[in-house]
């Protein structure tokens, strides 16, 4: 048996080690020295011994007074294990590796006790049982119980109670062999478990007192049982301790060191033992020796051992010899010999740790539920959570107090030994040598039993089954008695400890009561109990950290009484002889009764001991909420669970350790598992608010109280009779349950019971299960025992449900009230961690053996599984949670009630799972035991059930896919910067004081800022300039919302090197009362570098740059043209490097394998490399300046440099920037860079024009950096107004009286990037369709000539215009789309929208994305494209599908032209309006031409209306297409374009020209142009182009010039095609079709053609159809354009659409440019004289549609001039200067200057230039920044891929679902397409079907209203038309 037990012990040791330290080996090593002492508590089988040993060690450590002894194993260990809690959590744990923590230090801090306890939990559980008697003896001389809990790491334990306990224990301990053991174990126990020794002593004494041999069989059994329970609890504590960095049990304890010393002494080796060096006097009790042996076998060698192997053969041999001799002695004197036995156990390989655990358990009274001061102090000293400290304290106390109950035997070595022997006898029967087992029984047997029980309880089962049989027979009558008997049994069998660990609050109390009874029964039950309670209180306090741990332990104690009876029957009894069993039963009955009473009193006392009973109550309630409703045990377990989770995780790290010390964790897991089960059955997850446990508790409490009273009465009446009766009840249920458990899994049984009983039943079941488990632990049935040991509570709970519910509840009522209260308080205090100690301890009490078993059995990983079968695991975990309850019927009831209570409250307990930066907090834990055995957190493989809400709540992470987890594991976004707070104001109000941040610098005064900057910059005096600014919160801006400046801060002299703007925070006088908001280094980079950069960047970017569309480029209304109207010269912004992407939520290159950070248009690797070199070099040079001037911000930006170096600019280390934006004459409206790094800054390097590089000289045109919300202070930095006035006089500060700027605005609001993208998509889609249809375009072209004739017929509308429209070929658009031309500019004008998108995308830029989307909008006339002849005839117009204009106008050309041309693309102006707009656009240039074009178009389209105006207007009706074109129209010019379109639009020309020419007199066209021109200010042509689908006409007219200019401008923005708009000039001018074609070719050639593309497609859309007609030469262009994707609808709206696009392009730089370009091209094609000039000019002024004005013929020039005159409005923003509080502080950056500001927090802007020209910019701002979330390696490619996988998976799931539901996913995509391309789609059908056109014709003919015109789906589709409607 000894060998078997030693085997178990070693097995246990690993478990214990695991609990102490994740590194099993390390723990094993540590345990060699530490375990001996511990094994006295554990291995001894009697807790007393272990406790004594521990006590000894503790004293030694305390003697060391926190000085490393240097000789213990931990001290000798040089490197951390890397597996323990402290090593694993090095970042948060400030404690030394558990493996390296000096035993003495641990003892002093009680941490060793933790560690020992953890070890002892498993090892000491059994050993402690035997050692308890020894401890008693030892405690006499030394406080072995808990008085020295402080030394035991349970320092927080209440010292008062400890002292009381010590006294009581001392008084008790002296009795009998306690002295003997005291001499032996006391040295060890006191040194190691000085605190626990005392409690153990009383227990031992009690056991010892009673242990007359007959009684002391029972007493011994009781002691053993209780010791085992205590050991379990202790093991849980130890586990918790190990998890929390408590000394590993394996660390050499003082006992171990004494053994080492003695070994060295006897072997004449160099004594490396502790200075204590009482080698000869070293405790040699069997438990201690066995513990030491187990440790030694696990690699714990004497400190000075020189053996090479992992073990010291000599030492092992010596220990074996000692153990043999000790066993002999133990056999000789079963009780007195217990201490010796513990020594022998240690010697005989009984791990001292186990012995110590047993002793500790004995030393730890069950009553110490509440956390004590020791726990608090421990938490502080150990820097661990209070929960952990409580757990440790509880374990410590349990090891001493609970074992104390067992200590009855343990305290007296012989008696505990006998008890242990009885237990061992029963266990040993299985194991072999009962006597050897007796020493081992408590510890080793307990451990073995745990492992065996879990594994099958082979060794223990054999003896257990007999004992259980006899015991059960005896006990069946009285289940309670049986439980009491199992108390010893629990000590001997780890099953009982499991119950003890499992016991929940009430159960715990019951266990305490039972413990008290046991204590009394052995000797003076009440006295012993009181003594135990004293220590127990301390320990319980400690344990109370985790009510589960302690409660379980306590419950186990009580339940041990109850369950011990059962357990004794099952385990101890089986091992014990019948006499011993009987004795134990009798003793247990009396003892239990007394113990219950004492425990109740003690509990009351304990509750008072709590720091805050209310808080504790709240905590307890919380825990209960958190705890599973099944049993309060579970709550306890859950309390333990939380710590267990951590521990389990850590244990998982070292599975071996997991096996050894996971017991506490598995119990908690078991508890969790049961909780889920209970929750499942009892709505565990119900919201805490919904869970009303009070009623349930009240009922249960009443029942429990009644039951307790009954039990107490029965106990008081008869030790056995009452106990037997209660036990018989409990036993009946518990045994039945046990039997069931034997056959059925504990979980199953428990679940069944719980399901049937509800929460209360569940609780009872848990208790019963725990009880039955306890019995089972003693039972020989392997599975049963295993289940019992793992989930003894579960079985007990089942039994309890059957029989013990009532009695258990009775006890529970009292215990429940008190214990629950305590638990609640504790929970409130510690939350879920509270469960840790309780769970742990209880689980170890009940699962101590299970732990071992767990180590042996994978199921043990599951909280309960280790002891339970897979099924049993679930139920038993509950029981396990409340082993004490399980042991006691009352305990069962209590446990059940507690569980129920806890279950209801359990929701308050939270489960925290974290993966990477994501932490999932759930209120419950539904874990299958399998899951819990692994992590305490279910894993996918461990999912106990199908995915459910409860399952997800239980462990959300387990339901995540690996890709999702990988995403989750990615670092979370950095939290927003937290800046220093102050007490100056109640709450910082940034609205009043301005943004608050300090990373640029701050100080209490302005003078401090000067000092700060002088220190940073290295110069003083005039070199540093401080300017105070005042935050007003009133933004200075023009009436149109554009930036203005009221004060300009300039560099005063060469001496001034650095200028800082500081803000005094209103109402602040703190250290951050003044903050720096801007730093300007006037000489940031060398002058030469600045000069070269200016020229290089200008040349490269102007040619190849790809403008970036930025929202800040426009005012709020998106109608300003602050960047300039000429797409060729307008200001633009170019982005390089890495920047943040909303799509990726990280770097925009996330999916780029080979990102081009300096991407230029086309394939220009050399240019890109050139830019790369320049910017990288500049970033490298700017970074040091940034670091010098703003070190904190710099550091913030380089934090993640190493990780995300791919997203950084710079050639040297120290790369704060990720990207750079080059702003060339770009006016940035007031904005904040919201996506910048939250605690970083932007660094702006300014390069200025040659005329602005001299200090003191103010250039004609300059750009200022403005802070719109600030005003300049009236005083200088020194508070002097005179000084400020002097600065103003010298020019340092320029005070402006006005800020005159030309008011430039777009015809219509520019589209957002999103809109443009959508439009582009639509346009692209339409374009494709049109292209397919346009295969017929040649015919159209032929027809277009006819149309052209018609257009010619209309002198007002030149055919050329139509041709230009034709020229606006989709190909051109496509080319422009390709950015053949200077796409950058045009795209910019389009704001990149047009250009990036298809020509159609250009169209998309326009409101009428369908038309714009299809430059073939003429396709709207698309009918034309389809119908080579202007099928516009269907409008009743001749094939002059100029009729489209008419039909667009729906017959009311006049009305529409006037309305539409005039101003309302949206209104769908009449042809006249359009014509007027066109005329205006063309100005005087070709009013006639425009009309002619209009007339031509109308004729061409429909001869019907010689009054081209109407036709033209109709064309403008077609304009609706342009209106679609309005996507281009989106551009400010959009409306204008519309207006112009009637006159100029090539598309309109075919239709409108005929109409407009006829209906519109040149005057009308002119007026249209004129109206357009005003809008042209932003882009006259664009406007006209936009407004006129027929715009070609208007564009061809004078509008052509101005319109082209505008168009070009927009085109430039939108696309280089705008430049080609200049080509469109020919449009205005009469240009042969060939010429037009050439123009078109030119425009295509230009990148900006993209805008034109839209133009050709947009403008020509109708022309496309009309192309054949192409209104003459324009027809060709139109054909091409139509071939370009011009949707039929677009064609329908052709004239308008085309010119609309064109116009729009100019007006909407980003969106309209293509259109404008097309229009321009069309116009160029048009033989308009102005068109010709325009053509020339357009090519020249391609970027400046407005420049077309200059290039246009006089007529056009005039019209353009008119347009300009109208648009050339200047504003001085007077109102801003009338209010002093309106802000507008500007800084005039110098050449090479570096400006640093927090752009993310401060509103900033740059003023518009009078004449922006990015080709020769007045200022180039190189803005270096770091966007947020650019912290992933390789641009976040891995994250992106993971995301894609996730999306793909989702898509797959959706597909499967769709397939399952029979839904076609295509429908969704189609729907989406319809959404964005609905118009296009609609248009496309018209394009495809002439019928559609006829329908339109009919509509058009029938009605003049836009609505009628748009009766077609096209109208709706063209969205833009809706405007007109």
From Swiss-Prot:
List the residue ranges forming a coiled coil, or say none. Answer: 1837-1870
Query: What's the catalysed reaction?
Result: a 5-methyl-2'-deoxycytidine in DNA + 2-oxoglutarate + O2 = a 5-hydroxymethyl-2'-deoxycytidine in DNA + succinate + CO2; a 5-hydroxymethyl-2'-deoxycytidine in DNA + 2-oxoglutarate + O2 = a 5-formyl-2'-deoxycytidine in DNA + succinate + CO2 + H2O; a 5-formyl-2'-deoxycytidine in DNA + 2-oxoglutarate + O2 = a 5-carboxyl-2'-deoxycytidine in DNA + succinate + CO2 + H(+)
Q: Its Gene Ontology biological processes?
A: chromosomal 5-methylcytosine DNA demethylation, oxidation pathway; eye development; nervous system development; positive regulation of gene expression via chromosomal CpG island demethylation; positive regulation of transcription by RNA polymerase II
Q: How is the cofactor bound?
A: Binds 1 Fe(2+) ion per subunit.
Necessary cofactors: Fe(2+); Zn(2+)
Free-text comment about domains = Binds target DNA that contains at least one unmethylated cytosine via the CXXC-type zinc-finger domain.
Q: Give the function comment from the record.
A: Dioxygenase that catalyzes the conversion of the modified genomic base 5-methylcytosine (5mC) into 5-hydroxymethylcytosine (5hmC) and plays a key role in epigenetic chromatin reprogramming during embryonic development. Conversion of 5mC into 5hmC probably constitutes the first step in cytosine demethylation. Selectively binds to the promoter region of target genes and contributes to regulate the expression of numerous developmental genes, including pax6, rax, sox9 and six3. May also contribute to the regulation of target genes in ways that do not require its enzyme activity.
Listed name of the protein = Methylcytosine dioxygenase tet3-A
Q: Which organism is it from?
A: Xenopus laevis (African clawed frog)
Taxonomic lineage of the native organism: Eukaryota, Metazoa, Chordata, Craniata, Vertebrata
């Amino acid at each position: 048996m000894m060998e078997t037990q030693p085997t178990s012990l070693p097995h246990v040791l690993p478990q214990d080690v695991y609990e102490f330290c994740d590194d099993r080996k390390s723990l094993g090593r540590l345990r060699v020295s530490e375990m001996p002492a511990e094994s006295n508590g554990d291995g001894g089988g009697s807790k007393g011994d272990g406790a004594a040993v521990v006590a000894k060690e503790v004293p030694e450590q305390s003697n060391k007074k926190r000085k490393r002894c240097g000789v213990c194993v931990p001290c000798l260990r040089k490197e951390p294990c890397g597996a323990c809690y402290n090593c694993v959590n090095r970042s948060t744990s400030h404690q030394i590796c558990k493996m390296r923590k000096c035993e003495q230090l641990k003892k002093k801090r009680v941490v060793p006790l933790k560690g020992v306890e953890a070890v002892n939990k498993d090892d000491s559980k059994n050993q402690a049982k035997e050692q308890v008697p020894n401890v008693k003896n030892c405690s006499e001389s030394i406080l072995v119980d808990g008085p020295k809990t402080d030394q035991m790491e349970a320092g927080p334990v209440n010292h008062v109670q400890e002292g009381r306990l010590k006294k009581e224990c001392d008084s008790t301990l002296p009795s009998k062999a306690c002295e003997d053991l005291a001499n032996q174990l006391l040295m060890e126990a006191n040194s190691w478990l000085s605190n626990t020794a005392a409690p153990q002593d009383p227990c031992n004494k009690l056991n010892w007192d009673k242990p007359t041999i007959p009684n002391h069989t029972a007493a011994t059994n009781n002691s053993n049982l209780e010791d085992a329970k205590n050991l379990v609890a202790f093991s849980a504590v130890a586990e918790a301790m190990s998890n929390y960095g408590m000394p590993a049990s394996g660390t050499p304890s003082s006992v171990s060191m004494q053994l080492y010393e003695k070994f060295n002494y006897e072997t004449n080796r160099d004594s490396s033992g502790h200075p204590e060096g009482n080698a000869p006097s070293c405790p040699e009790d069997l438990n201690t020796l066995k513990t030491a042996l187990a440790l030694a076998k696990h690699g714990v060698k004497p400190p000075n051992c020189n053996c090479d192997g992992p073990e010291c053969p000599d030492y092992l041999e010596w220990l074996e010899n000692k153990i043999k001799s000790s066993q002999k002695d133990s056999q000789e004197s079963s009780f007195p010999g217990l201490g010796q036995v513990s020594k022998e156990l240690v010697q005989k390989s009984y791990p001292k740790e186990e012995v110590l655990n047993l002793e500790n358990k004995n030393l730890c009274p069950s009553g110490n539920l509440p956390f004590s001061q020791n726990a608090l102090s421990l938490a502080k000293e150990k820097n661990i959570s209070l929960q952990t400290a409580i757990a440790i304290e509880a374990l410590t106390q349990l090891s001493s107090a609970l074992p104390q109950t067992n200590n009855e035997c343990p305290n007296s070595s012989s008696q505990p030994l006998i008890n242990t022997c009885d237990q061992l006898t029963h266990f040993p029967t299985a194991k072999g040598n009962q006597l050897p087992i007796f020493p081992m029984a408590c510890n080793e047997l307990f451990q073995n039993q745990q492992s065996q029980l879990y594994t099958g309880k082979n060794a223990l089962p054999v003896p257990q089954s007999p004992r259980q049989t006899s015991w059960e027979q005896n006990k069946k009558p009285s289940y309670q008695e049986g439980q009491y008997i199992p108390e010893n049994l629990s000590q001997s069998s780890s099953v009982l400890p499991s119950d003890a660990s499992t016991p929940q609050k009430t159960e715990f109390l019951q266990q305490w009561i039972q413990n008290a009874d046991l204590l009394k029964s052995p000797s003076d039950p009440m006295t012993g109990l009181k003594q135990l309670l004293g220590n127990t209180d301390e320990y319980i306090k400690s344990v109370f950290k985790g009510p589960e741990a302690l409660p379980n332990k306590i419950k186990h104690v009580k339940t041990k009484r109850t369950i011990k009876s059962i357990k004794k029957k099952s385990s101890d009894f089986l091992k014990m002889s019948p006499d011993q069993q009987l004795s134990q039963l009798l003793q247990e009955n009396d003892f239990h009764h007394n113990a219950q009473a004492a425990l109740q009193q003690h509990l009351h006392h304990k509750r008072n001991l709590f720091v805050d009973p209310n808080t504790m109550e709240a905590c307890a309630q919380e825990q209960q909420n958190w705890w599973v409703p099944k049993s309060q045990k579970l709550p306890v377990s859950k309390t333990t669970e939380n710590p267990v989770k951590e521990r389990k995780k850590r244990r998982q790290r070292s599975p071996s350790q997991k096996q050894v010390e996971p017991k506490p964790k598995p119990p908690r897991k078991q508890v969790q598992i049961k909780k889920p089960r209970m929750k499942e059955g009892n709505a565990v997850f119900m919201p805490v608010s919904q869970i009303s446990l009070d009623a349930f508790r009240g009922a249960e409490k009443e029942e429990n109280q009644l039951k307790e009273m009954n039990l107490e009465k029965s106990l008081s009446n008869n030790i056995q009779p009452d106990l037997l009766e209660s036990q018989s009840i409990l036993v009946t249920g518990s045994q039945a349950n046990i039997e069931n458990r034997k056959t059925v899994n504990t979980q199953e049984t428990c679940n069944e019971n719980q399901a049937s009983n509800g929460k209360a039943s569940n609780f009872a079941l848990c208790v019963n299960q725990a009880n039955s488990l306890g019995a089972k632990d003693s039972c020989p049935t392997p599975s049963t025992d295993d289940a019992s040991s793992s989930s003894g509570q579960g079985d007990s709970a089942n039994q309890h449900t059957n029989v013990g519910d009532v009695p258990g509840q009775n006890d529970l009522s009292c215990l429940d009230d008190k214990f629950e209260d305590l638990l609640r308080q504790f929970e409130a205090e510690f939350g879920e961690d509270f469960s840790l100690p309780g769970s742990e301890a209880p689980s170890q009490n009940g699962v101590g053996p299970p732990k071992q078993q767990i180590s042996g059995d994978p199921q043990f990983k599951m909280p309960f599984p280790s002891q339970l079968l897979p099924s049993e695991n679930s139920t038993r975990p509950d029981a396990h949670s409340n082993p004490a309850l399980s042991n006691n019927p009352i305990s069962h009831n209590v446990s059940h009630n507690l569980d129920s209570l806890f279950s209801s409250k359990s929701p308050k307990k939270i489960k925290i799972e974290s993966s990477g930066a994501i932490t999932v907090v759930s209120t419950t834990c539904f874990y299958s035991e399998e899951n819990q055995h692994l992590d305490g957190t279910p894993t996918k493989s461990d999912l106990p059930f199908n995915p459910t809400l409860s399952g997800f709540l239980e462990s959300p992470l387990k339901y995540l896919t690996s890709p999702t987890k990988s995403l989750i594991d990615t670092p979370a976004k950095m939290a927003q910067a937290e800046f220093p707070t102050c007490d100056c104001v109640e709450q910082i109000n940034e609205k009043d004081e301005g943004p608050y941040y300090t990373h640029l610098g701050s100080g209490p005064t302005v003078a401090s800022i000067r000092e700060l900057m002088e220190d940073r910059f290295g110069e003083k005096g005039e070199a540093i300039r401080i300017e105070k600014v005042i935050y007003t919160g009133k933004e200075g801006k023009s009436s149109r919302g554009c930036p203005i400046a009221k004060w300009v801060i300039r560099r005063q002299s060469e001496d001034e090197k650095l200028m800082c703007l500081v803000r005094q925070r209103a109402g602040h006088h703190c250290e951050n009362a003044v903050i720096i908001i801007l730093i300007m280094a006037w000489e940031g980079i060398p002058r030469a570098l600045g000069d070269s950069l200016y020229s290089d960047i200008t040349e490269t970017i102007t040619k190849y740059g790809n403008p970036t569309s930025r929202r800040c480029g426009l005012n709020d209304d998106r109608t300003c043209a602050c960047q300039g109207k000429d797409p060729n010269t307008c200001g633009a912004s170019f982005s390089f490097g890495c920047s943040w992407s909303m799509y990726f939520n990280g770097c925009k290159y996330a999916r780029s394998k080979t990102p081009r950070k300096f991407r230029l248009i086309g394939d220009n690797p050399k240019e890109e490399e050139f830019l790369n070199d320049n910017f990288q070099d500049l970033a490298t040079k700017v970074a040091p300046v940034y670091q010098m001037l703003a070190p904190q911000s710099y550091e913030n930006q380089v934090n993640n440099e190493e990780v995300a170096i791919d997203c950084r600019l710079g050639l040297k280390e120290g790369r704060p920037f990720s990207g750079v934006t080059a702003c060339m004459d770009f006016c940035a409206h007031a904005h904040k860079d919201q996506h910048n790094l939250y605690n970083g800054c932007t660094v702006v390097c300014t390069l200025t024009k040659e005329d602005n590089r001299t200090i003191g000289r103010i250039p004609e045109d300059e750009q200022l950096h403005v802070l719109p919300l600030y005003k300049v202070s009236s005083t200088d930095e020194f508070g002097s107004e005179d000084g400020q006035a002097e600065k103003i006089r010298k020019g340092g500060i320029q005070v402006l009286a006005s800020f005159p700027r030309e008011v430039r605005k777009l015809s219509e609001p520019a589209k957002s990037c999103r809109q443009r993208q959508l439009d582009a998509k639509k346009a692209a889609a339409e374009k494709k369709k049109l292209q397919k249809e346009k295969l017929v375009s040649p015919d159209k072209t032929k027809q277009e000539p006819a149309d052209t004739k018609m257009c010619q017929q209309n002198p007002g509308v030149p055919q050329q215009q139509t041709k230009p429209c034709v020229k606006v070929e989709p190909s051109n658009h496509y080319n422009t789309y390709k950015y053949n031309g200077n796409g950058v500019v045009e795209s910019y004008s389009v704001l990149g929208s047009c250009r990036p998108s298809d020509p159609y995308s250009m169209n998309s830029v326009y409101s009428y994305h369908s038309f714009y989307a299809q430059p073939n909008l003429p396709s709207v006339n698309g009918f034309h494209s389809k119908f080579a002849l202007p099928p516009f005839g269907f409008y009743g117009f001749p094939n002059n599908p100029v009729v489209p204009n008419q039909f667009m106008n729906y017959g009311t050309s006049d009305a529409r032209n006037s309305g539409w041309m005039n101003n309302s693309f949206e209104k769908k102006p009449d042809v006249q309006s359009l014509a007027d707009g066109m005329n205006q656009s063309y100005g005087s240039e070709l009013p006639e031409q425009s009309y002619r074009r209009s007339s031509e178009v109308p004729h061409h389209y429909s001869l019907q209306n010689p009054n081209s105006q109407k036709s033209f207007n109709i064309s403008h009706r077609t304009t609706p297409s342009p209106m679609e074109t309005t996507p281009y129209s989106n551009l400010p010019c959009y409306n204008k374009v519309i207006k112009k379109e009637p006159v100029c639009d090539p598309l309109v020309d075919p239709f409108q020209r005929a109409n407009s020419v006829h209906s519109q007199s040149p005057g009308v066209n002119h007026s249209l142009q004129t109206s357009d021109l005003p809008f042209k200010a932003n882009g006259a042509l664009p406007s006209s182009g936009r407004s006129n689908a027929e715009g070609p006409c208007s564009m061809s007219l004078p509008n052509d010039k101005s319109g082209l200019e505008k168009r070009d401008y927009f085109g430039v923005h939108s696309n280089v095609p705008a430049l080609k708009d200049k080509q469109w000039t020919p449009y205005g001018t009469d240009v042969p079709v060939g010429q037009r074609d050439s123009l078109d070719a030119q425009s295509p050639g230009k990148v900006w053609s993209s805008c034109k593309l839209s133009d050709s497609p947009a403008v020509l859309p109708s022309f496309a159809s009309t192309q054949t007609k192409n209104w003459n030469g324009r027809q060709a262009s139109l054909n091409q354009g139509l071939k370009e994707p011009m949707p039929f609808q677009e064609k329908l709206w052709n004239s308008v659409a085309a010119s609309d696009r064109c116009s729009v392009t100019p007006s909407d730089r980003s969106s309209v440019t293509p259109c404008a370009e097309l229009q321009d091209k069309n116009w160029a094609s048009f033989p308009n004289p102005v068109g010709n000039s325009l053509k020339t000019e357009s090519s020249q002024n391609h970027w400046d549609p407005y420049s077309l004005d200059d290039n246009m013929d006089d007529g056009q020039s005039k019209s353009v001039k008119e347009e300009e005159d109208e648009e050339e409005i200047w504003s001085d923003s007077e109102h801003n200067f009338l209010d002093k509080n309106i802000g507008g502080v500007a800084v005039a950056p110098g050449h090479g200057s570096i400006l640093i500001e927090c752009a993310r927090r401060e509103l900033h802007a740059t003023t518009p230039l009078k004449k922006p020209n990015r080709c020769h910019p007045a200022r180039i701002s190189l803005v270096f920044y770091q966007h947020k979330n650019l912290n992933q390696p390789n641009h976040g490619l891995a994250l992106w891929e993971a995301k894609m996988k996730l999306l793909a998976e989702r898509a797959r799931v959706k597909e499967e679902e769709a397939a399952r539901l029979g839904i076609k996913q295509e429908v969704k995509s189609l729907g989406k397409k319809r959404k964005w391309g609905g118009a296009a789609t609609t248009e496309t059908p018209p394009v495809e079907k002439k019928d559609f056109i006829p329908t339109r014709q009919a509509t058009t003919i029938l009605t003049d209203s836009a609505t009628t015109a748009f009766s077609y789906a096209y109208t709706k589709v063209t969205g833009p038309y809706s405007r007109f409607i």
